[in-house]
Amino acid sequence: MTEVLYGLDAAERARVAALRAEGRFFWLDTSLSETSREDLVDTLGIPERALSALRTAPHGYASRAFHADGESVVFALRCYAELEPVEEQAGYRLRPMEVQVLVTSDYLLTLHDERVSLPAVLAPDLPPGRSKGYVVYSVLDAMLATTSDALDEVELKLDTLVAAWTEGDGGGVPRATLRQAGARLATMRRWVRNEQAIFERVGLETGALRDFGTSEEPYFDRLEDQVDRLLTSIDAAANAMGMVLDLQLNERAYVLSVVATIFVPLTFITGFFGMNFGWMVDQVDSAVAFWLLGFVIPIATAALLWRLLVRPFIKGDPR
């Protein structure tokens, strides 16, 4: 069974040395906030070319951080975990974290800045007796699964907004929430598209590593298919958000058109009062008549029209 290690304290270093002496493949996950790259080199004997690739900042274009030299494969991915909340992603439980991955014939290394145990977050299925290629596939598959979970979070947020909007009083959808969802989907799509290019090479390059062989099942082809499905799902979620915006804009245009029709009779009313102003002054000979004709009757008429005609027209006939 593949052994999984987290961190690089004295006990873990001794265990790594023992596993390497026995020729057993293992997965080591560690945080750069707890371990230095020099410690990794001393413990794992990372090749110089792979170390240079690991030193490349994973931010920006993840596909540019890809490195393969026949002895190691280095690339950067993104997964989602429950991390400390940040202001621009308030309301979401899962936060993105960038992970640098190093695959050699002896071990799998995952490196990140956050103090979090990736094996505990991903909990991949690593049954005994499976090949090295399957171990790498299982870890990468679990990382992609967290992206699916994060996408589900966005879709559930949109579903909640639509339900609250349709079942409530027709109030507008919060713009801040839509902006957060749109930004999250855009960032997610950019990273998944980069990962699509990465996974097209990972299967080929890892197959060239010692003891990985070429007779493996097409595990990495499954990852490519999964990335394609993720891109399709992200685009569908973005389209759904666009539909929410369209519905909200249509409702606002609908209300504005109704309000605009209310002002159409004003031309007739002002013209009538202007042409008959002298007659009205002669007829209004008491304070009661002034209040009735000037305030009570117009207000009552407007309220009645609103209640019987305008409001049902805006809200829709419940029958």
Predicted feature descriptions by range:
Residues A62, L204, R210-D211, M280-D282:
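A short hydrophobic/aromatic micro-motif that marks alpha-helical segments and, especially, helix-coil
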Residues L122, E205, L247, Y254, ...:
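Residue-level signature of transmembrane alpha-helix interfaces in integral membrane proteins
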